[in-house]
């Protein structure tokens, strides 16, 4: 087996091949679906090369100060929005089964969201979220983190961030800000799994690359209003650097035409050891005449594209509607589809070239597409929670590799038993990466084996010379085979989802991960340009300066550090008697995440003592700390007190209503949290809202001295979006609010 050794940027290990444009959806083959067993799928005759040991993990880095040093074991995370739970059936092979992929953008490494019917992102401009249940969503942030590997940030001297970031897609999701953490996380938006092993579609069709395939069931979901996304971004221009916000929609991003040029990354040169791969064409999307035997494929050189033409693509794509069966998305796009001479086009063309996006490739080359040589080792499926931690993500990647390795060994033993010889040949593939999609093509035939829109990638990790690519299937509106609840009524976080995992071997595993992260950043820039937004306006420094001048957690630090508020109580109770309390979560974003006393049973031990009040936060019970524990665990500890006669509590006396103070100097600064029906659903880490004391799961009771308990949802959003200066709010846990207002019957423990 000939290993294809490619030159990297520094070491000459990267085979950098370019294609003029990704294969259009309309040219993708239709194939039947194939359900992969949970144990995994490995093509016969494959053998996994030994994994190289992992390099030491990089130190945790802040999102704006990243070292360029990478880690040989990095990972990329994308949790997409659970709000976007419309159906999108994706065909696979052989069994005629349709699977679905579901949105889930809030990763525990960045956002903590509660179960809401929908989200409302606070901004001065409304932004709809395509969901069946939520009301109009108003978004309040764009991101400061980009999808880049190995802990580097995409901003000037910064390299790839380890954060996660959803990207706008064919149904543009809310643009959410994501923080960076360790292990080189990077993130996309909507996850999906498309056309596993299409039988034809080698990418060499001459049809328009603007034609996109759509299922009939998606028509309603495609009718989003991009106008509102763009308006929101324009009003939040100071939030993030474009180089660190890698959100993009393959449908809204640039789609190079067949006549566009092929430009290779200058620092990357193709250098392969003699093998059959040297005979492969550099361009995957050849014109029809280039496919005839007599035509020289390598000599084909498309028309050179000027910078102005490059900048015009994304806007033309949005204006022309991409031949999709959706209505015109913006009021200024209702003219003829060939009329691109509108003010925004001129504005886009006036923008400078790409803002610096650190990575191994030139931005223009990622638009055209680049190719890495790799060996396809196999695929498997894993069950995963909605928002697993970073460590669990990496463990899942390692588990996928282990399963594929076991399957390869089994295939090898079976082949020997059948006296077929022990010659093992790995499937050599070309891994095509662009701002539109990631494709896996057979190295010899150039037939498409797998095709994923860039937005569908939920996670990617490189472990030594192994690359693991993951995508999670969307949930249908009704019960789905892809979601298995462990117990009836289980919380969302307890549900299990099927993750499809593809495993590849390549000496450029790290570069592959970096290139995918860079592709997200470039795609996001193209999305902004397409909608008349100058990426250079998204400055992070000014927002960071505002953050650094604000106190953390409002008055919480003072309150919790005051010894008069910290009490140690001794409660007497009868054996077999319950404590008689209801506890709720303090809410993500609180200085000490623990449980809050929400109600007490009349005549119960807690009420009889006269020492407890609603709103008190319980730090420990009988020496067992409750800080940071899940609500169910805390409830279990309290239930375990039933047979005891004395209970020792450590509490912090707190009022039931939390006071929030958000300092917003200007409307251009995002608030950094989302609400639905007055309930805070998610919170941006490190934003002015977190600094001010906003907590996930809290119900907003009052804004600037005015009660909003009976106020319509839209008016709450409007009040917050238009507020500037000091924004005073009062909130309390939503569960406590429902108990106090009689909307729920308390279940005492």
From Swiss-Prot:
Compositional bias (Basic and acidic residues): 305-315
Residues recorded with modification Phosphoserine: 11, 208
GO biological process: chemical synaptic transmission; in utero embryonic development; locomotory behavior; multicellular organism growth; nervous system development; presynaptic modulation of chemical synaptic transmission; protein transport; regulation of gene expression
Claim: Phosphoprotein is one of the keywords in the record: yes
Regions of compositional bias (Polar residues) in chain numbering: 70-80, 238-247
Keywords from the UniProt entry: Phosphoprotein, Protein transport, Repeat, Transport
Chain positions covered by the region annotation STXBP1-binding: 185-270
Domain PID: 368-555
Tissue occurrence: Brain.
Source organism, top-level taxon: Eukaryota
Domain notes: Composed of an N-terminal domain that binds STXBP1, a middle phosphotyrosine-binding domain (PID/PTB) that mediates binding with the cytoplasmic domain of the amyloid-beta precursor protein, and two C-terminal PDZ domains thought to attach proteins to the plasma membrane.
UniProt protein name: Amyloid-beta A4 precursor protein-binding family A member 2
Gene giving rise to this polypeptide: APBA2
């Amino acid at each position: 087996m000939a290993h294809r050794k490619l030159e990297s940027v520094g070491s000459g290990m990267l085979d950098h091949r370019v294609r003029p444009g990704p294969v259009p959806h309309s040219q993708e083959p239709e194939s039947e679906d194939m359900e992969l067993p949970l144990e995994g799928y490995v093509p016969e005759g494959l053998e996994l090369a030994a994994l190289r040991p992992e390099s030491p993990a990089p130190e945790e880095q802040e999102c704006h100060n990243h070292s360029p040093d990478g880690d040989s074991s990095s990972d990329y995370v994308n949790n997409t929005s659970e709000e976007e739970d419309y159906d999108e059936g994706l065909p696979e092979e052989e069994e005629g089964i349709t699977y679905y992929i579901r949105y889930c953008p809030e990763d525990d490494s960045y956002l903590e969201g509660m179960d809401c019917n929908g989200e409302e992102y606070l901004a001065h401009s409304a932004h709809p979220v395509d969901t069946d249940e939520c009301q109009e969503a108003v978004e309040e942030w764009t991101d400061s983190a980009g999808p880049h590997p190995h802990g580097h940030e995409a901003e000037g001297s910064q390299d790839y961030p380890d954060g996660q970031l959803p990207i706008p897609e064919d149904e543009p999701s809310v643009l959410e800000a994501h923080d960076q953490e360790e292990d080189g996380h990077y993130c996309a938006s909507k996850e999906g799994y498309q056309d596993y092993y299409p039988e034809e579609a080698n990418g060499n069709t001459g049809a328009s690359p603007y034609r996109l395939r759509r299922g009939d069931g998606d028509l309603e979901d495609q009718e989003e209003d991009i106008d509102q996304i763009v308006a929101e971004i324009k009003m939040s221009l100071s939030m993030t650097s474009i180089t660190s916000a890698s959100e993009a929609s393959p449908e809204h991003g640039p789609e190079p035409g067949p006549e566009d040029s092929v430009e290779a990354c200058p620092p990357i040169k193709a250098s392969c050891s003699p093998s059959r791969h040297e005979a492969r064409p550099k361009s995957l999307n050849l014109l029809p005449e280039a496919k005839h035997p007599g035509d020289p494929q390598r000599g084909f050189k498309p028309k050179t594209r000027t910078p102005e033409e490059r900048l015009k693509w994304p806007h033309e794509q949005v204006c022309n509607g991409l031949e999709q069966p959706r209505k015109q998305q913006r009021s200024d796009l209702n003219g003829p589809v060939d009329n691109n001479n509108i003010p925004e086009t001129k504005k886009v063309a006036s923008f400078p070239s790409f803002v610096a996006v650190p990575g191994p490739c030139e931005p223009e080359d990622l638009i055209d597409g680049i190719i890495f040589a790799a060996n396809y080792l196999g695929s498997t499926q894993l069950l995963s929670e909605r928002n697993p931690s970073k460590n669990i993500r990496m463990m899942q990647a390692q588990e996928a590799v282990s399963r594929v390795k076991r399957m390869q060994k089994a295939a090898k033993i079976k082949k020997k038993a059948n006296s077929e010889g022990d010659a093992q040949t790995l499937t050599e593939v070309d891994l095509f990466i662009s701002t539109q999609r990631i494709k896996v093509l057979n190295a010899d035939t150039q037939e498409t084996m797998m095709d994923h829109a860039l937005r569908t990638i939920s996670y990617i990790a490189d472990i030594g010379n192994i690359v693991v690519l993951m995508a999670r299937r969307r949930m249908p509106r009704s019960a789905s085979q892809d979601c298995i609840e462990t117990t009836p009524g289980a919380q969302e976080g307890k549900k299990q989802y099927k993750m499809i995992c593809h495993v590849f071997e390549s000496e450029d595993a790290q570069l592959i991960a970096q290139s995918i992260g860079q592709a997200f950043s470039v795609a996001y820039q193209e999305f902004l340009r397409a909608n008349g937004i100058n990426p250079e306006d998204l400055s992070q420094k000014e927002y960071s300066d505002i953050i650094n001048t604000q106190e953390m957690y409002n008055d919480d630090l003072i309150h919790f550090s005051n010894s008069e508020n910290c009490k140690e109580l001794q409660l007497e109770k009868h054996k077999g008697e319950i404590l008689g309390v209801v506890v709720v979560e303090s809410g993500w974003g609180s200085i000490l995440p623990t449980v809050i006393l929400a109600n007490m049973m009349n005549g119960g031990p807690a009420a009889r003592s006269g020492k407890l009040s609603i709103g008190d936060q319980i730090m420990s019970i009988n020496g067992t700390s409750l800080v940071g524990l899940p609500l169910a665990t805390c409830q279990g500890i309290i239930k375990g007190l039933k047979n005891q006669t004395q209970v020792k509590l450590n509490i912090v006396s707190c009022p039931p209503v939390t006071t929030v103070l958000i300092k917003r100097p200007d409307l251009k600064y995002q608030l950094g949290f989302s609400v639905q029906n007055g309930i805070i659903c998610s919170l941006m880490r490190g934003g002015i809202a977190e600094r001010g004391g906003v907590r996930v799961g809290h119900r907003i009771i009052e804004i600037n001295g005015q009660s909003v308990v009976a106020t319509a949802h839209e008016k709450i959003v409007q009040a917050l979006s238009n507020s500037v200066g000091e924004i005073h709010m009062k909130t309390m846990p939503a569960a406590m609010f429902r108990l106090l207002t009689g909307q729920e019957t308390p279940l005492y423990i």
